[in-house]
Amino acid sequence: MAGASDRTGVRRPRKAKKDPNAPKRALSSYMFFAKEKRVEIIAENPEIAKDVAAIGKMIGAAWNALSDEEKKPYERMSDEDRVRYEREKAEYAQRKV
């Protein structure tokens, strides 16, 4: 069987399914920026709405062009979301016990 598969015969352990009630992880400052910027980019360029790679490159370039001062609001959102996540994670752990 030429080119059949790369398998070595070693079984990998199955990944445990995530509990749908578990809290969502905190977003990074970049992710808050990307959510906001993606909407702007698609509104300005509807023809590239399906080109995820191009949009990602544009978002990355825009993020890198921001000064530290311009990134502060997104860092603040990230800090607030991290606090939310830690609180929800603690509540979730209490419910599981």
From Swiss-Prot:
This is High mobility group protein homolog NHP1. Keywords: DNA-binding, Nucleus. It is found in: Nucleus. GO terms for molecular function: DNA binding. It comes from the Eukaryota. Residues 23-93 bind DNA. PANTHER family: HIGH MOBILITY GROUP PROTEIN DSP1 (PTHR48112), MITOCHONDRIAL TRANSCRIPTION FACTOR A, ISOFORM B (PTHR48112:SF22). GO terms for cellular component: nucleus. Residues 1-24 are annotated as: Disordered. It holds the Pfam family HMG_box.
